[in-house]
Amino acid sequence: MKYVILSDIHGNVDALLAVIKEIAEKENIIDNLLIAGDIVGYGASPNECCDIVRFLIYGRKKAGLESISKIIDQPYLDSKQKENILKAIISLEKKCIAIGGNHDMEASGEPSLTSEMNPIAKTAVDWTKGVLTKENLKFLRHLSLRMKFSKGGFEIVHSTPSYPRGYDYVKNAGALKYTTLWSKVTFGGHTHRPAAYIYTKETRTVNASVLIPADNYDMRLMLIEKESTNKVESFDIDFGKEWKYYINVGSVGQPRDGNPHACYVAFDSTSKHLDFRRVPYNTEAASKKIQEAALPNELAQRILKGA
């Protein structure tokens, strides 16, 4: 089966539309689109992103095509581009499965970790909470925090599988252990930085620092933890060995690895091949929406810089 896994859309409808179009054009037919949390937060289009995701999950009975067409009607898109994006969304109808992240939980009124959010994030999540429709509040509130796919040998979680509500940042291989990973492959997000780590029963090793280096090293692990000097964008997962993998799929709506392009992962559970993808989109439009919503300017600038 072929899966696309993405995370951290963060209310950025411009990035989401570009990624959906790319998936339809580049990945051919996929079996499932998986979203690893944080559909909202930071960006200025939380309802639009929720409406699209609800359509992808439940189909047109829960989110009509008319409302989707209105969302697609962006001034920088021509009629042909709009038509292609609508076709792409329809092609993924009822193929999506989504879990929640900390911003989703907080914005929907679920107890979370607002006190631990920085002031900019808290300002954005409070604004998001105030503009979300009742339907989207309910939708976010009922999202699971973890989802396992036994046939594929993997699971998705926003941060860590052992304590999904804790929203710990997996910034390097030392943040996890073999015993705290419950599946052969775990796909997560939260840091907004793509990465891939291999864990063995004896040691922790970094298989590949995908696209960017890990944030930092624990010097005590340096003898067993090595980082690839290559910017690997694809590799095969070895199901024959007793290894476990943690794959950070990066961010669609607010990358923080110095590359402003949206990021997602394509995974084929039959061939065991995994690809990281980057998708350019209209960052100026997304940044302008944030400014017009009077959200913190730092968020508008971060969209442009990817950092």
Describe the predicted segments one by one:
Residues 1-4, 149-155, 239-245:
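Beta-strand-turn-beta hairpins that frame and shape the catalytic cleft
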Residues 55-150, 154-157, 163-182:
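Active-site neighborhood of divalent metal-dependent phosphoester bond hydrolases
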Residues 6-7, 33-38, 42, 73, ...:
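Active-site neighborhood of phospho(di)ester-bond hydrolases with catalytic His/Asp-centered motifs
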Residues 125-132, 137, 148, 159-173, ...:
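Active-site-proximal loop/helix segment associated with metal-binding centers of metalloenzymes
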Residues 10-17, 41-44, 103-108, 148, ...:
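Active-site environment of divalent metal-dependent phosphoester hydrolases
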Residues 23-29, 92, 150, 180-182, ...:
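Glycine-rich phosphate-binding loop signature in dinucleotide/nucleotide-binding domains
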Residues 202-307:
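Acidic, His/Gly-rich catalytic cores of divalent-metal-dependent hydrolytic chemistry
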Residues 1-88:
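N-terminal active-site segment of His-dependent metallophosphoesterases
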